[in-house]
């Protein structure tokens, strides 16, 4: 057991800890996904399965564990199943139809043993199937060690090949591609566990004016709304401007705005913070005078004023944070 090591995925692959580049890619993509939905990067680790606990079909297996109130919990599993499933099917069915063809960028030449068809014997034996048998013989990538053997044809049927039907010889062949059995990387995500840890990592509780004050610092990508639009009062034209802003936000692809005009502005800010909306736009008396609004940032409650046009533009370009 190597213990806990801190390194990049590239370093883990280069040192042989991660055994296949595709597995390293899946580990890195899992990391990116978890960070993107708001998981704390300091509370993520990847644990490699020991050979004694690995599934019989796996060549390498990793768990992504997240740390929360209940300690380290497995939330993602990534297994390199290699070609176990397809190869097992091929061995038991005798069919090679589950192989895939890989075309080379440039033709390659190599010396190999081949079984040259003997038409004088194949023709009378297989009659109208003789052409299919010859094609299958020419496409053989593994020469059998002994005769007779069962040859699988393109349609999945088989033909029994005996010594008199072929001549074994070595020749220079030009290869334009190769057949291979695809490998499978199997990721499994525990969505409920991930969601629980998002909430666990993002929830904070402080004191404000002698009362508990909750803030859910959700990443904007998973927040219930991108922005809350709050008229200071639901009258005097502030409500109309707020509804116009709300309609503009909800017309933008990928953005959702929440309009809230109920209770005091302080109570509404608290509701916005509690459910994790990252931004709040407040329409007040100054808005009626110069068309500017207050933009409030959830995580530190900082506020700035900007024109409605500027705020909408920065929301659309995902750059509203540049106002601060």
Where in this protein do the model-derived segments appear?
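NTP/phosphate- and nucleic-acid-binding module
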Residues: 1-324
